A protein has these predicted regions:
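Helix-to-loop junction immediately C-terminal to a conserved catalytic motif
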Residues: 79
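Conserved coupling/switch loops of ABC nucleotide-binding domains, chiefly the family-specific signature
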Residues: 85-88, 138, 238, 270
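ABC ATPase nucleotide-binding domains
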Residues: 60, 99-261
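The feature captures the beta-strand-to-loop junction immediately N-terminal to the Walker
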Residues: 64-66
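Non-catalytic connector elements of ABC transporters
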Residues: 2-12, 21, 266, 276-390
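Conserved ABC transporter NBD signature motif
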Residues: 87-95
Length: 390
């Protein structure tokens, strides 16, 4: 097997913005990792069920889902820590079933970091290289290179208990990378960090992955984390892949009510399709009247569908919009959540359903024009409505 990192690092597409990196759209592109109908069962529980997935060289891929959905099991199968009951896992076209974990060019960074408390930072990073019996001079050079890469120069002689949580996370990352794997697996790597540090570290991970050109696969239940770092996201539930797409596609074009509800905040309105045009779908809803959506759909007249609306795409005002009664509902403000950058209004419609509208706080310390118990109108553009058939 060749060096997957070098290939992707020299890819002119990869050297531009992350948006230009899209090998999954190229039918001739070859996957580095392929799950082919993989299943894994523990007792009577199907942890992973018939998963097929391609991950490409140089890709930052996120497995996202609630606890117990099978994402960590999928990671362990790739690492060789568990064995599939069905299906194959290929690395660069070769079935890796016969290859033991320590022979696979794959490293895994665990949520707990698993640092050796009796070893220094340098000792922890060098541990795997010493196990391989590399010359001392090479070990020293590679450890120094990794510590510089993760910005831990000058801390090599410290023990783990003398480091902050963020520094321990970097030591674990350096130890995972020092053996130069083709694929790095990250199991909830930022879960132990506070929110601010977690946000900063997400961008550091992205920059590091871009610089090295390696394939990263991260497991997380944090939607914001997955949306921030990943080129693509695989959303999992009950052992199955529900949708695989880029972060904007997952957010703006979810393939089901479940994905729409799991990724961020959403208003879901049930209705029945009245008409399907070339670019527009008309829905009749008992909750919200007549709705128009500029959303691609395979729905037919008479089908029951869900209409998903992100709160930030819903306008809130004291007066109805001049466009008329379509895509417009009236209600009363029941609650207001101030989130700093946003204010979220919970509005109880006349039929009892609650919808949310999110408004950016673009001015400072200005009294809200809309308050509790106000009578308001919610409206949205047709392109803001997503039609979901399942």
């Amino acid at each position: 097997m060749g060096n997957g990192g070098a290939d992707s690092r020299n890819d002119p597409q990869r050297q531009g913005t992350r948006r230009t990196f899209a090998p999954w759209t190229d039918p001739t592109a070859r996957a580095l990792v392929r799950f082919d109908g993989v299943s894994k069962q523990f007792a009577a529980v199907a942890a992973v069920e018939r998963v097929s997935l391609d991950i490409f060289p140089g890709e930052f891929f996120a497995l996202l889902g609630p606890s117990g959905c099978g994402k960590t099991t999928l990671l362990r199968l790739l690492a060789g820590l568990d064995t599939p009951d069905e299906g194959r896992i290929l690395l660069d076209g070769e079935d890796i079933a016969p290859v033991p974990p320590y022979r696979r060019p794959i490293n895994m960074m665990f949520q707990s970091y698993a640092l050796f408390p009796h070893l220094t930072v340098e000792g922890n990073v060098a541990f795997g290289l010493k196990q391989e019996g590399l010359p001392k001079t090479e070990i020293t050079a590679r450890v120094e290179e990794m510590l510089a890469l993760v910005r831990l120069e000058g801390l090599g002689k410290r023990k783990p208990h003398q480091l902050s949580g963020g520094q321990r996370q970097r030591v674990a990352l350096a130890r995972s990378l020092v053996k130069r794997p083709r694929v790095l697996l990250l199991d909830e790597p930022l879960a132990a960090l506070d929110k601010k540090l977690r946000g900063e570290t997400q961008f550091e991970l992205m920059q590091l992955q871009e610089r090295l050109g390696l394939t990263f696969v991260i497991v997380t239940h944090d939607q914001q984390e997955a949306m921030t770092v990943a080129d693509r996201i695989g959303v999992m539930d009950h052992g199955r892949l529900i949708q695989v797409a880029t972060p904007p596609e997952i957010y703006e074009r979810p393939n089901s009510r479940w994905v729409a509800d799991f990724i961020g905040e959403v208003n879901l309105i049930e209705g029945r399709v009245v008409d399907v045009g070339a670019s527009e779908t008309v829905i009749a809803s008992a909750a919200a009247g007549r709705l128009r959506a500029l959303s691609p759909t395979d729905a037919k007249p008479g089908d029951v569908v869900g209409v998903a609306l992100r709160p930030e795409k819903v306008r809130i005002a004291h007066a109805p919009p001049p466009t008329g009664g379509e895509n417009c509902v009236a209600g009363q403000v029941g609650n207001i959540g101030y989130l700093g950058d946003l204010s979220v209004y919970k509005v109880r419609l006349d039929n009892g359903i609650v919808m949310k509208a999110a408004v950016a706080n673009v001015t400072r310390l200005v009294e809200r024009p809309i308050g509790w118990d106000d009578r308001v109108w919610l409206s949205w553009a047709p392109e803001a409505a997503m039609v979901l058939t399942r």
